[in-house]
Amino acid sequence: MPHIDSEAPAPAAEAPTEQLTRLPFPPVTYSHILHCSYHHWQPRYRTLVPKSRAIRLTAPFVKYLRADGIVLPPEAAPPTDDDNLDTFSDDGADEEPDPSVEWPEIHNQIKSTITEYGGKVTPKLNWSAPKDATWMSATNDTQCRTANDIYLLLKSSDFISHDLEHPFDDCVSDTTTTDDSSSTPPEIPYYLVLRKYVNFNPSLEFRCFVRNRVLLCMCQRDQNHFDFLFPMRDSLRSRIQTFFDEKLKDTFTDPNFVFDVYIPPPHDRVWLIDINPWAERTDSLLFSWMEILHMKDPVDDAPLFPEFRLIKRDDPEAYAFTTPQYSAHKLPKEVVDASISGPGGMSEFLGKWQDILAKQAQESDSDNEDQ
């Protein structure tokens, strides 16, 4: 974890006396995950979020997102002088089928929303944005100008795959307090959220942690040092606290949650960006979940001074250019797993890879001899 600057002592609790095998979260219910889905909370906080549109997805479109491979609808190319030359035309014999014929209404809604929002949008599903797939984008961010830009990001993202395949991992039904794998998860109404593209300043986005409707702590989201944030810390904390007290504290469905805000210049308005589950799957960023879970509640309704963590200038781990964010998602899973298991695991993987290459070379030589 990067070194942080903390001007106020955290409301820490005593360290646990026995070794824990898992973080002491309360049971995460199916309903809590659904309450953190964009389609659930956005209508209630419509005036607090950037301009966006949620498109209800049909079963054929969800099936398309889940399918292996990336097949994009054809895009009309501008006419050229070569269009009149039919010498080498194959009449489209090798063209892939158009997947959008199975969901034309979704395709048209996406295109019309892009036009309505000035030609640029950023996509997400119920919980996640495809931030891990920006390496597939020509702009190296989640900015999308066409429907195919959106499909490419969604189908290239592990985060989106998790929304589709594992939204209820480690969850329990609302009628039990223990892990019950036999319970049937509820059906999920999937939505594609298209937000009007705004060039966000990542230094001004903050993550805030709420337990029992008390704002415990907050921190910057981008893990780089920003010197200008330090003189602003008290005023930013005050604005976030006021925003929470007036807009979220008594209105969000659950008492425990994590929310993200954005406070652009002139820093007098707080925008709600996302609401996340109070669960280990949510990145605790500059805190550890263990210290958050062991923070003490205020006594007798005494006001709590939430800790606001920022990254210091002299933190060598704070400069993200050394390790690009989501870099692990750009590699095959086998490579990531091998690197996690240490030098031995990577050596074993490289040995297997060399064997595969050698076998392919032998097969290629055999094919050449047969010709």
Swiss-Prot record:
Looking up Pfam families in the UniProt record yields: D123 (PF07065)
Statement: the UniProt record of this protein carries the keyword Cytoplasm: yes
Binding sites annotated in the UniProt record for Mg(2+): 274, 276
Kindly give the InterPro entries that the UniProt entry links to this protein: CDC123
Q: Where is the composition biased (Acidic residues)?
A: 80-99
Q: Which residues cross the membrane?
A: none
Q: Which UniProt keywords apply?
A: ATP-binding, Chaperone, Cytoplasm, Magnesium, Metal-binding, Nucleotide-binding
The protein's name: Translation initiation factor eIF2 assembly protein
Q: Which organism is it from?
A: Aspergillus niger (strain ATCC MYA-4892 / CBS 513.88 / FGSC A1513)
